[in-house]
């Protein structure tokens, strides 16, 4: 078994394979095929939703990257998603004192996973924008998971559970991985505004887009 493992490491060293499909892509995180598939998931800019910017449809490679980030805390997945998010933020020409924060995870889930994937994504965006990260949001209670809930149920689930710790008097960019109904983002944005944020802009890596029938 050790010999087989040695041969595998020699012939297929770690770090040379695509993080989504394992195809060889020396020096890059995504192979050409997965990168093209990810680019095809990009959402057009919606001028009517200036306070919420979602980069990719929550499908295909984009969805796979979010799952890697959320369920496996994969920093490489955060790096890939953060690139387009940072490009979008830099294009906004925000004030110099703008700070980044993230949608906080319930303590019980954070302790179970050992890491907060939202913070990982936020810090990856920070490294590309130069904007500082502040932990502003905290959960006052541990709600149930939001997965599978509609907007009304999500709002009820997190009602009064998110608050802003301390005060803030600048523009805040709220980072999240998936926008589903917008309920969680709305509650977080309201908490930030109550704490004094002059403007809150949510930037999410992906968005669930319902198919039109």
Can you name each region flagged by the protein language model?
Residues 1-176, 180-213:
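Glycine-rich phosphate/pyrophosphate-handling loop used in enzymes and phosphotransfer proteins
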